[in-house]
Amino acid sequence: MTRAKANVEPISFPPPRAGEVPRNAAEGGRTELPLALPFTNPPSPILIEPLVRAALAEDLGRAGDITTDAIIPPTEIARAVIAAREPGVVAGLIAAGLAFKLIDPNVQLTVRAPDGSEVTKGTAIAELEGPARALLTAERVALNFLVHLSGVATATQQLVKAVSSTKARIICTRKTIPGIRILQKYAVRCGGGLNHRFGLDDAVLIKDNHIAAAGGVAASIKALRGRLGPMVKIEIEVDTLAQLEEALAAGAEAILLDNMPPELMKRAVAITNGRATLEASGGVTLERVRAIAESGVDFISSGALTHSPHALDLGLDFL
């Protein structure tokens, strides 16, 4: 039976909140330390479309959706709702919406809980109407993006809430799933976190293997200063207080405290005394993050936000 098509709004997103910094359409540009960017507006569909197309091509294979095409008439119109099956934070509607639109541009998606929204079990996130074949064919790819990115946003918000009333801000890292970093970084922002560098080209971060290859902390910083000049801000990773003092003496503007216990971080904060931005990294869990924040560091970075978040349980049901 063919259902009458109702008038529904096309997919749309709210404008950036006051104080947010928009990125350009290419997500380009460079930023200086501190490496934290407070914006939540979604990345351009121009950048997202190739990722969604690749996911659809992977799912459709050579023959397409042979089950749906065999049993659903091409004229069948259907309505569906995407709803939360557990509490969390929504992220990824831009990718989910594109998945349906790329299968059939006649699909209409109405957002009920925009990206960045906190939802409870049963909350309607979006409503869909259009060719039933398109809804069925795009369903899994759309949900794959949505449950993963909402999981990233939810995990981020949990850390953000845990460090509330401290000065520490939660940031993500480059430990992302290959190919979808731009979406994962966006999901972190939806959860209230901030972004560290997007790639190797937009900020300097001297890691432990750089130090080993270059011959030490001071040697690494000196080499960078000679190559990049005095205007480029330098962040360097240290795991001892001796390395911290060496980095400060060499003029590092930001220092990453790698896998230090909170007690040692407190000493690092006292030694630094405001001379550099301090980032804590390593072993960041929901149980430990408050103690890390109370050490007095400026930023807390977590790779787990993007490399191993729990997927938020969401479902799509026909009405």
Labelled PLM ranges:
Residues 3-6, 16:
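Compositionally biased, low-complexity intrinsically disordered regions
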Residues 3, 36-250, 254, 263-271, ...:
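Acidic/glycine-rich phosphate/pyrophosphate-binding loops and surrounding catalytic core
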Residues 259:
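C-terminal active-site rim and adjoining tail of enzyme catalytic domains
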Residues 10-12:
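Generic short N-terminal amphipathic or hydrophobic helices
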Residues 315-319:
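Active-site loop ensemble at the mouth of alpha/beta enzyme cores that anchors a bound cofactor
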Residues 18-20:
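Glycine-biased, low-complexity coil/linker segments
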Residues 22-24, 33-35:
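Intrinsically disordered, low-complexity segments enriched in serine/threonine/proline/glycine
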